[in-house]
């Protein structure tokens, strides 16, 4: 990255003339667009995505406006967007990673970095096609945008230099062979060199590639593809009659086209220096690949490099067809490979570029190109036929087989042209796809080995195996082969597609040996990529003539053939594996018959099974001569009769019985229902009550207190009173709950103001009687009042389990105006109850005193002492301590003065009584 910052603008300029200006204008508009809140995901998305910033920085991560825009972008005095929609940077500081707007140096790379989106034709074609030769092909920007040497990617930088070197190295060879020079210049000006030619090539290639990859033409049009100065798609038919040459070339081009895209996408070095030079021919002008042109074009010294890249290249290109898997894989691997290959090739060029004997390199190049072509063409057939032309020369079956393959190829072309969907394509594509996937993986593995090995260019791809020959021998052979191939292609062209078709179909059906051949070849080719070295060893043993693995042909009419191989399947497989053997003419009708025969065999098989079933049934499962229909109807009838028979008596009986029984039943049912409902109601009541544990406890307390007599000593009077009250129905409690709230508050205020000094016992008694009268209404209210006041009578202790309703807990706290408040909050429990272990363990947990009485007095006293606190502000209940009851505070406050228990109780009771009176 840093590399280019220094040259920020220059990088954009020279090589990129078009693209830069275009992108600049684009970015202006983009700026406008950015003011929309969405941050224009379209552009920014992919671009920023390739540089993987952590999400926060990716400007488009999820709109991440909130994350960084306000801070990073915000200019001086603007609110979110005021004055600044898209011009984030204008006023504010520009974070580096964002410097991606028109002026930023970054753009150099960011533009090219977005292969995923624009990979094929959209932007790139826009920028390239206009001034394509000027800008895009210039050495510097060989892969239009990416490679500007300044652009950040190290690969591209290297590439730039590499290209220069390559060019130097090639200076001489270029003069030598015009064709070659063309191929080398092509990277620079693919489109400069006469358009007619490129168009021509394009037609050929696109046509053929159209056949091969029916979808390919879309790719071909992209200016990136070597062959389309103008996207002209030729109808496949033209190509169908084309010679082997275009065929070969298309195999390359079909493969290379994608590879070109992928290169541009991945900045493959090949696009630029080495590829352009080395494989230049195969890449850019398919016509030169064709065997006819093979001889000169392949031979640049750079060739030495190209092959290293080529396989990778091809695999990359191919895989780029399958964008899902391939692109990603290749994008990753491609970068590294490219880097690696660039370095190596650079070195290689320097060392060998000039020194290598041009002649040798040429021949090797052609030979290599040949081999490459052969094993690149992983499509079973194209790959095959090319090989065949070479192979069979060695095997002396030259003429027939190559012709065959050629015919087949033409046949296939025509078929494909007619029905883009034909099986051949599908299966062919599959094989290719597999091949490609495999290749792209393999090429990684093989790449080092193959680089080393291939430098010697001495592979000859033979039918027999990869026979490794010394270049000297191979050169001659290759020349001859080239001639042969030319001858053959000419011959082939003459054949009419119809003948071819018929022959082909003939061949289709004898598929065994070719199948084998194809598989063999395919295996070999992948094998070769995988480990060229091993191939060397293998070469010796796998001479095809000796080791003949024959696949026993499965006769089509064999009745045992599994149904799975039905007509379509066979047809497809045979089409794919065109058979090279049978040359004699067989009318197409034979073939038609054959698949039918196979179909009929499956039918006959079914028929056979059916008859067997019938036979068995007749023999072993004889049924009474009843038809199924009869049998089932009889079942139905029987069931109907049965039901009717049963039904009528039942009905009558029911009628007879019903008046009494039904009445009985209904009565019982009604009672049950009533009972249930009552239970449910009761349950509901219980449930409601008990839903709140506190209610439950209160209820229990009530019940218990009922049993205990009211006649308890004055000491217990308040307790007993409470007991009387508690039994009251809970409903009343509920109804008075609210009242009690208000009353409670009033009580507190009043009682707090009323003096705490004890009044005479008599007055207290009066009050008690009044209270008892009130009990009905106040039951719970009282309970509540006293609850807090547990301190007065012994029971006081328990209330430390904060037992009251939730409100109560707090009331008590610091505000406790003596027992008064606390009364309001906690229900006081009668003495006996208090010690109920169920409720209150008399534990030191709650009291610091072991002695209960002390505790009581202490509490009462404390309460009283505290009472003064609130008296002044009588009106308000201070629930000061929120949730903790009095005892928590007291617990920590020392024991205070222990008063006489009686006295405290009396005082408290007095207070209670007084309060009640006031209430009344």
UniProtKB/Swiss-Prot annotation:
UniProt keyword Transmembrane helix, yes or no: no
Biased composition (Basic and acidic residues): 47-63, 160-196, 353-373, 384-396, 472-502, 638-656, 668-750, 763-785, 908-920
GO CC term (a single one): nucleus
GO biological process terms on file: apoptotic process; cellular response to leukemia inhibitory factor; DNA damage response; negative regulation of DNA-templated transcription; positive regulation of apoptotic process; positive regulation of DNA-templated transcription initiation; positive regulation of intrinsic apoptotic signaling pathway; positive regulation of transcription by RNA polymerase II
Biased composition, class Low complexity, residue ranges: 135-154, 751-762, 810-825
Compartment(s) where it occurs, according to its Swiss-Prot or TrEMBL record: Cytoplasm; Nucleus; Nucleus speckle; Nucleus, Nucleoplasm
Domain of life: Eukaryota
Residues that bear Phosphothreonine: 341, 355, 402, 431, 494, 566, 661
Compositional bias (Basic residues): 23-46, 87-134
Residue(s) of cross-link: Glycyl lysine isopeptide (Lys-Gly) (interchain with G-Cter in SUMO1): 580, 831
Pfam families listed in its UniProt record: THRAP3_BCLAF1
Role, per record: Death-promoting transcriptional repressor. May be involved in cyclin-D1/CCND1 mRNA stability through the SNARP complex which associates with both the 3'end of the CCND1 gene and its mRNA.
Quaternary context: Interacts with Bcl-2 related proteins, EMD, with the adenovirus E1B 19 kDa protein and with DNA. Component of the SNARP complex which consists at least of SNIP1, SNW1, THRAP3, BCLAF1 and PNN. Component of a MACOM-like complex, named WTAP complex, composed of WTAP, ZC3H13, CBLL1, KIAA1429, RBM15, BCLAF1 and THRAP3.
UniProt-recorded name of the protein: Bcl-2-associated transcription factor 1
């Amino acid at each position: 990255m840093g590399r280019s910052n220094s040259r920020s603008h220059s990088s954009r300029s020279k090589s990129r003339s078009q693209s830069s200006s275009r992108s600049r204008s684009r970015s202006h508009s983009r700026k406008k667009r950015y003011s929309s809140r969405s941050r224009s995901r379209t552009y920014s998305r992919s671009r920023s995505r390739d540089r993987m910033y952590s999400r926060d920085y990716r400007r488009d991560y999820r709109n991440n406006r909130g994350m960084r825009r306000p801070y990073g972008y915000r200019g001086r005095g603007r609110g979110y967007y005021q004055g600044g929609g898209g011009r984030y940077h204008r006023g504010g500081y520009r974070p580096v990673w964002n410097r991606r707007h028109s002026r930023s140096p970054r753009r150099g790379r960011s533009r090219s970095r977005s292969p995923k989106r624009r990979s094929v034709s959209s932007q790139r074609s826009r920028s390239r096609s206009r001034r394509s030769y000027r800008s895009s092909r210039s050495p510097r920007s060989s892969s239009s945008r990416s490679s500007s040497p300044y652009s950040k990617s190290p690969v591209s930088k290297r590439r730039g230099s590499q290209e220069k070197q390559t060019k130097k190295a090639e200076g001489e060879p270029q003069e030598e062979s015009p064709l070659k020079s063309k191929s080398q210049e092509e990277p620079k000006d693919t489109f400069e060199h006469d358009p007619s030619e490129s168009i021509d090539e394009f037609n050929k290639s696109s046509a053929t590639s159209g056949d091969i990859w029916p979808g390919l033409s879309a790719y071909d049009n992209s200016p990136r593809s070597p062959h389309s100065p103008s996207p002209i798609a030729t109808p496949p038919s033209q190509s169908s009659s084309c010679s082997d040459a275009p065929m070969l070339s298309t195999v390359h081009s079909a493969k290379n086209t994608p590879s070109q895209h992928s290169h541009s996408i991945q900045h493959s070095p090949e696009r630029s220096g080495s590829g352009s030079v080395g494989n230049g021919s195969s890449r850019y002008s398919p016509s030169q690949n064709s065997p006819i042109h093979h001889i000169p074009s392949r031979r640049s010294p750079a060739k030495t490099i190209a092959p290293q890249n080529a396989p990778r290249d091809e695999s990359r290109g191919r895989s780029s067809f399958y964008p899902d898997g391939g692109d990603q894989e290749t994008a990753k691997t491609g970068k590294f490979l490219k880097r690696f290959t660039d370095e190596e090739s650079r070195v290689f060029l320097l060392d060998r570029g000039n020194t290598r004997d041009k002649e040798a390199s040429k021949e090797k190049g052609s030979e290599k190109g040949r081999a490459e072509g052969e094993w690149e063409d992983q499509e079973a057939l194209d790959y095959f036929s090319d090989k065949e032309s070479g192979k069979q020369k060695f095997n002396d079956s030259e003429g027939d087989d190559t012709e065959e393959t050629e015919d087949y190829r033409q046949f296939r072309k025509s078929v494909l042209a007619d029905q883009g969907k034909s099986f051949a394509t599908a299966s062919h594509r599959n094989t290719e796809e597999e091949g490609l996937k495999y290749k792209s993986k393999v090429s990684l593995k093989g790449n080092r080995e193959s680089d080393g090995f291939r430098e010697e260019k001495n592979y000859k791809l033979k039918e027999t195996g990869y026979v490794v020959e010394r270049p000297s021998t191979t050169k001659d052979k290759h020349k001859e082969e080239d001639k042969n191939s030319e001858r053959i292609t000419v011959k082939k062209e003459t054949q009419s597609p119809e003948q071819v078709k018929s022959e082909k179909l003939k061949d289709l059906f004898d598929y065994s040996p070719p199948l084998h051949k194809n598989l063999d070849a395919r295996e070999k080719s992948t094998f070769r990529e995988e480990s060229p070295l091993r191939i060397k060893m293998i070469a010796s043993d796998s001479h095809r003539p000796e080791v003949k693995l024959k696949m026993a042909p499965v006769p089509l009419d064999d009745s045992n053939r599994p149904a799975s191989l039905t007509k379509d399947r066979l047809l497809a497989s045979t089409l794919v594996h065109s058979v090279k053997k049978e040359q004699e003419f067989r009318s197409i009708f034979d073939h038609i018959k054959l698949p039918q025969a196979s179909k009929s065999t499956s039918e006959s098989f079914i028929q056979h099974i059916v008859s067997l079933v019938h036979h068995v049934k007749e023999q072993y499962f004889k049924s009474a001569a009843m038809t199924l229909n009869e049998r089932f109807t009889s079942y139905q009838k029987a069931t109907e009769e049965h039901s009717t028979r049963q039904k009528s008596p039942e009905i009558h009986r029911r009628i007879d019985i019903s008046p009494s029984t039904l009445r009985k039943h209904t009565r019982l049912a009604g009672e049950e229902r009533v009972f249930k409902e009552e239970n449910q109601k009761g349950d509901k009541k219980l449930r409601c009550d008990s839903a709140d544990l506190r209610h439950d406890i209160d209820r229990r307390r009530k019940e218990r207190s009922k049993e205990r007599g009211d006649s308890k000593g004055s000491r217990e009077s308040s307790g007993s009173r409470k007991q009387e009250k508690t039994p009251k129905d809970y409903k009343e409690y509920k109804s008075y709950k609210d009242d009690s709230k208000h009353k409670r508050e009033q009580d507190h205020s009043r009682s707090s103001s009323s003096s705490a000094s004890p009044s005479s016992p008599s007055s207290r008694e009066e009050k008690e009687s009044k209270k008892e009268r009130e009990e009905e209404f106040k039951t719970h209210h009282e309970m509540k009042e006293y609850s807090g006041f547990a301190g007065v009578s012994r029971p006081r202790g328990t209330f430390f389990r904060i037992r009251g309703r939730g409100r109560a807990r707090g009331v008590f706290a610091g505000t406790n105006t003596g027992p008064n408040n606390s009364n309001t909050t906690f229900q006081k429990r009668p003495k006996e109850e208090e010690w109920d272990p169920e409720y209150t363990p008399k534990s030191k947990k709650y009291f610091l005193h072991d002695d209960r009485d002390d505790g009581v007095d202490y509490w009462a006293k404390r309460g009283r002492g505290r009472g003064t606190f609130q008296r002044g502000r009588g009106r308000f209940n201070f629930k000061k301590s929120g949730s903790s009851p009095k005892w928590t505070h007291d617990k920590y406050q020392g024991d205070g003065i222990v008063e006489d228990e009686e006295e405290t109780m009396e005082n408290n009771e007095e207070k209670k009584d007084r309060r009640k009176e006031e209430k009344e």
